[in-house]
Amino acid sequence: MICAVYKSLRKAESYLFVEKRNDFERVPEALMAMFGEPKLVMMLPIEKRDHLGFADIKKVRSELKEKGFYLQLPPPVVNLLEQHKKEIGFNPD
């Protein structure tokens, strides 16, 4: 299976994988409105891949088959200062 990967021009580091190039029929309208105009990044032979950057390849394949698309969002931003404060038991009270 070869899928098309699009990036969002509106949402940084957000990618939409679809089964066929320029086929957004199975993608919900609300998602497309939020995603904005999709810009083609690459055509990807997904069956020949063992892994993808931040995405779980098995989940991508599964959602492409079930839903017809997969949305990859950026990982959450980690506040390292707050994380460190919790680790050392800092409490400003």
UniProtKB/Swiss-Prot annotation:
Gene3D superfamilies: YcgL domain
InterPro entries assigned to the protein according to its UniProt record, in alphabetical order: YcgL-like_sf, YcgL_dom
Chain ranges of the YcgL domain: 1-85
PROSITE patterns named among the record's database cross-references: YCGL
Top-level division of the source organism's lineage: Bacteria
Disulfide bonds: none
Annotated protein name in UniProt: YcgL domain-containing protein Spea_2443
Organism: Shewanella pealeana (strain ATCC 700345 / ANG-SQ1)
